[in-house]
Design a protein with these regions (language model features):
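Formylglycine-dependent
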Residues: 1-98, 103, 111, 117, ...
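Short, solvent-exposed beta-strand-terminating loops
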Residues: 6, 123, 189
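Beta-strand elements within well-structured catalytic alpha/beta cores of enzymes
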Residues: 60, 74-80, 153, 157-160, ...
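Generic, well-ordered alpha-helical scaffold segments in large soluble proteins
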Residues: 63, 115, 119, 156-159, ...
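Surface-exposed helix-capping loop/turn segments at secondary-structure junctions
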Residues: 66-74, 123, 166-179
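Histidine-centered active-site microenvironments of extracellular/periplasmic hydrolases
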Residues: 88-89, 169-211
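Residue-level detector of family-conserved "landmark" positions at structurally sensitive sites
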Residues: 126-127, 181
Length: 211
């Protein structure tokens, strides 16, 4: 896992043959990773399909195979980095959300309200409040780059959701779902940093480092 706050999701280390230079917070900022007692700096994955969220989940599932199959209790602390910056995600995940954020503030707002009603999370008597014109105008002025950034962020959360699902599926496969307490927590809030080291590139790729 990662010892510091964030790193490139596709390649935390140095450039691999045939690939672009992995973007970093600064040119000489090589983040340390560890595996058990071994610290790796740089950590350059040999797998070209490496993605941090997937890799952390792979280790969690392996741990459950090793320690969760017996009668002894187990404790798994699974600390994902996503959706912390940099904004990087698989293209197939980004594609799911690109059109969703391009429809505009009013339409997004209406769809979210309809979804809350569909899920039964709010009473139909709770109407959708009048829109704040300032918010709509602010959203309209964001531009295509910000809309793409929102799609990438959503894609990172989507992959995180897939990963948590894999862990829960493994617990079920082991027959431990009725005897396992699962707690999900999230820290931080909105990003307080503005980092656009690669303004000429769209967010999401290995050579792009943006918040």
């Amino acid at each position: 896992g990662l010892l510091s706050g964030c790193s490139n999701y596709f390649n935390p280390g140095i450039r691999r043959d045939g690939e672009a230079e992995p973007a970093r917070k600064s040119d000489d900022d090589i983040r340390p990773w560890c595996n058990q007692d071994t610290v790796m700096q740089p950590f350059t994955p040999s797998d070209p399909d490496f993605y941090t969220t997937d890799a952390i989940t792979d280790h969690a599932v392996s741990f459950l195979d090793e320690c969760g199959a017996g009668e002894e209790p187990f404790f798994l602390y699974l600390a994902h980095c996503a959706p912390h910056f940099p904004l990087q995600a698989w293209p197939e995940d980004i594609k799911k959300y690109r059109d969703r954020y391009a429809v505009g503030w009013a339409e997004i707002r209406q769809r979210r309200y309809a979804r809350l009603l569909e899920l039964g999370l709010i009473d139909p008597r709770w109407g959708l409040p009048a829109a704040d014109e300032r918010s709509e105008a602010s959203y309209a002025g964001l531009g295509e780059h910000a809309v793409e950034a929102m799609a990438v962020y959503a894609a990172m959360v989507d992959r995180l959701d897939q990963s948590i699902g894999r862990v829960l599926d493994k617990i079920r496969d082991l027959g431990k779902e009725e005897n396992t307490l699962v707690l999900f927590m999230s820290d931080n809030g909105g990003c307080a940093e503005e980092i656009h080291n690669t303004p000429h590139l769209p967010p999401g790729t290995i050579d792009s480092y943006q918040t």
